[in-house]
Amino acid sequence: MGKFQSKHAAAACKRRESPEGDSFVVPAYGSGRRGAEETDRRAGSGVEHRSRDKQELLNGDPKEGPFWDDKGSLEVVLPPEKSEGHEGQGQLFSTDDGEKAASREGPLRLSKKHLNIDALQCDVSVEEDNRQEWTFTLYDFDNSGKVTREDMSSLMHTIYEVVDASVNHSSGSSKTLRVKLTVSPEPSSKKECPLTGQDREPTRGRTEIELTDEPRVADRRLSAYSRKPNADPQPCSVRVPYCVDENTERRNHYLDLAGIENYTSKFGPGSPPEQARQEHHGRATHIPSRSRSQESDAHAIHHRRSQVLAEHVIPANEPATRALAAQPRIKGQEKQFLRSPKGPGKPLGTPGSGKPGKALSYCLQAVPLPQSAQDGHHLPQPPPQPPPQPYGHKRYRQKAREGHSPLKGHGQPTMVEHEVVRDLPPMLGPEGYVMPVVQRHEHHHHHEHHHHHHHHHFHPS
């Protein structure tokens, strides 16, 4: 968040120290000699010139030191556009944010009469690598197009901390930096920049067109506002700090970061927060809902499996009406299951749609199947319906074998066999015949070795 956003970060880190610092401290002590010295520095005087200028700034007394006498000729040269333009940063800031400038550097506004403020837009686009840019792209905090004062105050605290941390990396001197703060919701572009603590009320409705312009045009408007701050009723634009060309790539980069770094800080590097977090929260709620749908599928599989296993145990435990009530639901689920491509080679409880279903199926297989095996395998005639049991099994043997050979030959899903046998109970008459058929068919499908065991067991009878 406190990264240097200029293109040449490594090289410009040292080069931007002096212009950032002196451009704001300059108007405190005269203008002519400062402009000449700035012109010479831009023309390409060396690194030692910058370091001496920095020492001079840190000492706060520019007229001391021997090198001012050496540069006596430079005091006369005063190119108006570059020197005044660069001094214009200090003047623009003192005009824009008068209270803050007065608290930090009182005599900043003394040089107001020496400046030609028409050239203020020159310093916006001249030296890119001597500037440092922080872009805070803000979204709707509450999804209603309104930004409250609490949001803005916490945002300003965050911006102060970030800029302070970034500036301390580059220089130990006291600097006044200009931060361009734009609040832009998606439907209509707005600009909102209450920077000072005295005036933090957002001026939303009056400056909605600002952000749609190009950055240089917006900066030109800023210079116009600084020329006549009393004539224009928009204090927001007067207070917009740090005239920096908003790079389109950089802006898109921050917009891309908005979806990624949601939790770095409350107002992330171009992803502040609330709407991005709400989008993230929406995605997070979609993910649990998706997982809930998977859980519901797994629950349906578990329900299907438990119904099948309940049909194993029902002759010994519960009346047959529950199995009859459960048959249409299982039949509809099996018809759904027929259409899935993963169905053919897998048993009923493991359709491959979710690991919870598999785990539940295995647990159920481990727990109730021994009882069903005891009830069904070794006790071929359940206690409630002793007489119709063999008849139902003979009918079932014929139908099941007729159904198994063509269906398995074609590689159809195993649920088709179940549906073939499901169609048998209406022909079997009373409810007593239904239960053994379902029980034996499920036995035959899931445990074919038991089927052979039953076959040999029933064959003599």
Swiss-Prot record:
Renumbered residue ranges of the record's region Interaction with TGFA: 307-396
Single Gene Ontology MF annotation: calcium ion binding
Region (Disordered): 1-106, 176-205, 263-302, 321-359, 372-414, 441-461
EF-hand domain segment(s): 127-162
Bias type Low complexity, positions: 341-350
Matches recorded under Gene3D superfamilies: EF-hand (1.10.238.10)
GO terms, biological process: exocytosis; Golgi vesicle fusion to target membrane; negative regulation of canonical Wnt signaling pathway; positive regulation of proteasomal ubiquitin-dependent protein catabolic process; positive regulation of protein localization to plasma membrane; positive regulation of protein processing; protein localization to plasma membrane; Wnt signaling pathway
Lipid-linked residues (N-myristoyl glycine): 2
UniProt-annotated stretches for the region Interaction with DVL1, DVL2 and DVL3: 121-186
Stored InterPro entries: EF-hand-dom_pair (IPR011992), EF_Hand_1_Ca_BS (IPR018247), EF_hand_dom (IPR002048), Nkd-like (IPR040140)
Disulfide bond sites: none
Swiss-Prot/TrEMBL keywords: Calcium, Cell membrane, Cytoplasm, Cytoplasmic vesicle, Exocytosis, Lipoprotein, Membrane, Metal-binding, Myristate, Transport, Ubl conjugation, Wnt signaling pathway
Coiled-coil positions: none
Binding annotation for Ca(2+): 140, 142, 144, 146, 151
Gene Ontology cellular component annotations, sorted alphabetically: basolateral plasma membrane; exocytic vesicle; lateral plasma membrane
Subunit structure: Interacts with RNF25, TGFA (via cytoplasmic domain), and PPP2R3A. Interacts with DVL1, DVL2 and DVL3.
Family: Belongs to the NKD family.
Domain notes: The N-terminal domain comprising the first 224 amino acid residues is mostly unstructured.
Function: Cell autonomous antagonist of the canonical Wnt signaling pathway. May activate a second Wnt signaling pathway that controls planar cell polarity. Required for processing of TGFA and for targeting of TGFA to the basolateral membrane of polarized epithelial cells.
This protein's name: Protein naked cuticle homolog 2
Gene for this chain: Nkd2
